[in-house]
A protein has these predicted regions:
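Bacterial Sec-dependent N-terminal signal peptides
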Residues: 1-23
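Cellulosome-associated attachment modules in secreted, modular CAZymes
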Residues: 20-189
Length: 189
């Protein structure tokens, strides 16, 4: 009889631990630490089911509660808005100075902003795409207008995998606007 009680107790504790819920929270910021609003965050489970959504306000803060512990999740980040936001001829000048070797772009994030065709390098093609957007010849860049990064990771993504075994705070994302090399985009648009 004590063996059965012990077995039942172990099963109850295992189910109780699995039923534990946690919170994922953090900030969506520019590379200059300004909050970014209107970012849609979706938490997706392994079956591609959206289990939670959150849209940031202008502070960029987010908190997503009641996520089951021990589950593999993916956080998807998207931001809509005008492709023209933050794109100007000054961005073309700064990018051309970089290409000519006159003045290097100051960070991996500005390098990513200048790589509007997402080829992995900055070229004249990026400048042509910037020019076409500024002159309204094109109405968007290839892919998404906003790129997302985890701090310290220079590779952009829109999906970030995680497993919750406790509340996860400071799950921060850095975002930049494509083509906005000088950081002038309205991050709350």
């Amino acid at each position: 009889m004590p063996k059965y009680i012990f077995l039942i107790l172990c099963l109850v504790l295992a189910f109780a631990a699995h039923a534990q819920t946690y919170t994922l929270s953090g900030h969506v910021l520019t590379d200059t630490d300004d909050g970014v609003g209107n970012v849609l965050l979706e938490v997706v489970d392994a079956t591609e089911t959206v289990v939670a959504t959150f849209t940031t306000d202008c502070s960029g803060d987010f908190s997503i509660a009641d996520l089951a512990g021990g589950t593999n999740y993916t956080l998807r980040a998207t931001k809509e808005g005008s492709p023209f936001n933050g794109n100007s001829t000054f961005d073309l000048v700064v990018t051309s100075r970089h290409l000519l070797g006159i003045q290097e772009l100051p960070s991996p994030y500005t390098l990513a902003a200048a790589d509007v065709d997402e080829s992995g390098s900055i070229s004249v093609m990026d400048m042509l795409l910037m020019r076409a957007l500024i002159l309204a010849i094109n109405d968007a860049y290839p892919g998404s207008n906003w790129l997302f990064f985890r701090p310290g990771d220079p590779f952009a993504s829109v999906e970030f995998d995680f497993v919750l075994n406790a509340d996860m705070t400071n799950f921060d994302l850095i975002t930049i606007k494509k083509g906005d090399v000088n950081g002038s985009a309205n991050s709350c648009e």
